[in-house]
Amino acid sequence: MQYADEREEAPRSGEIRFDPCAVADGQSANFVTMVPRDSDLLPPVILLETTADQCPSRVSDAAVQSELTTLVNQIEAHSGKPAILAPVEEFEAAYAPSRRFDRQLWLTRSWVEPDYASRPWLMWTANRWYKTEAAQEPLRWVVVRP
């Protein structure tokens, strides 16, 4: 991502896709390398899209929760801002991050308002495949709660 070139265009943030099969230290090291420490950036987003069911070797729920806690702490220490957690429904059902972390939530469910988290969402991806002439690729249609 070219932050210097895009600073004038729109507010930016760093996103990281949590991998429950990998330790947090390596994941946060990649984030710290790619995302500058800049107070003008929006809060970082941690995408929680994959459960440990896809890992090549067994990873316990406790290990996933521990590594996620470590990742959240490291990302927030780097950014200086609380992270926004973006769990998909399957991840929320498996690990309940909306109960474990007092952070803003970005939920995803096409067309129907998501109700799978323990708290209200700040952001909602209402359509992941929105097509418009304004873009060559499908866009995410995101609703922000006032």
Regions found by a protein language model. Give the residues of each.
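Structural recognition of the beta-strand scaffold that forms the well-ordered cores
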Residues: 12-17, 42-48, 83-86, 104-107, ...
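Aromatic-lined carbohydrate-recognition surfaces of secreted/lumenal glycan-active proteins
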Residues: 79-93
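Functionally critical loop-and-helix segments that line ligand-binding/catalytic clefts
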Residues: 100-146
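Substrate-binding cleft of extracellular glycoside hydrolase catalytic domains
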Residues: 1-72, 76-78
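Structural recognition of alpha->loop->beta junctions
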Residues: 32-46, 50, 96-120
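Metal-dependent DNA replication initiation modules
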Residues: 70-74, 83, 99
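Extracytoplasmic/secreted cell-surface and envelope-processing proteins
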Residues: 24, 53-58, 92-97, 116-117, ...
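Active-site beta-loop-alpha junctions enriched in small/polar residues
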Residues: 18-20, 49-51, 88-90, 110-112, ...
